[in-house]
C-alpha cells in the first residue's frame, strides 16, 4: 500500500503532471528523430541529408523551448493549465503521428490543401471549368 501512496504523491500537483507531459514529449521527439535518421540511412530511395537532420533537430529544440517557456505564462491564469495541457497533447499527437509516418502505419504524404479543395468542390458542386 505504501508504494501506491508513493506513486500517487507524484500526481498530486499540476506541476508534476506538466513535467510528465514534457518528459513524454521529449521521449517522442527523440524516438521520432532516431527513426527518421535510421530510415533515411537504410532506405536507398531517400537521399540522406545532414541539412534535413539539422533542420528537424532545430525545429524540435525550438518546440521544446517554447513548451518550457509557456509554463510561467500559463500557470498564473485560470485557463492557463487546460490550455497548456491542450498544447502539450497536440505536440505529443503530432510527434506520434510522425513516428507512425516513419513506420508507414499512416499515409504521411497527404496534401491537406488538396483535401480541403476537394471537399469544397463536392459541397458546392462546382468545378474549376465552370468559372
From Swiss-Prot:
It is found in: Host cell inner membrane. GO terms for cellular component: host cell plasma membrane; membrane. Signal peptide: none annotated. The keyword Oxidoreductase does not apply. It comes from the Viruses. Residues 1-52, 102-131 are cytoplasmic. One of its GO terms (biological process) is killing of cells of another organism. The chain crosses the membrane at residues 53-75, 79-101. This is Antiholin.
Amino acid at each position: 500500500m505504501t508504494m501506491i501512496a508513493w506513486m500517487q504523491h507524484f500526481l498530486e500537483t499540476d506541476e508534476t503532471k506538466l513535467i510528465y507531459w514534457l518528459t513524454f514529449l521529449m521521449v517522442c521527439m527523440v524516438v521520432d528523430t532516431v527513426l527518421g535518421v535510421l530510415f533515411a540511412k537504410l532506405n536507398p530511395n531517400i537521399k540522406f541529408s545532414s541539412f534535413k537532420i539539422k533542420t528537424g533537430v532545430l525545429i524540435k529544440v525550438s518546440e521544446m523551448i517554447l513548451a518550457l517557456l509557456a509554463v510561467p505564462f500559463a500557470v498564473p491564469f485560470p485557463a492557463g493549465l487546460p490550455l497548456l495541457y491542450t498544447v502539450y497533447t497536440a505536440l505529443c499527437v503530432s510527434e506520434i503521428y510522425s513516428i507512425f509516418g516513419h513506420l508507414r502505419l499512416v499515409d504521411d504524404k497527404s496534401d491537406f490543401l488538396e483535401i480541403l479543395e476537394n471537399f469544397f468542390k463536392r459541397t458546392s458542386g462546382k468545378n474549376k471549368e465552370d468559372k
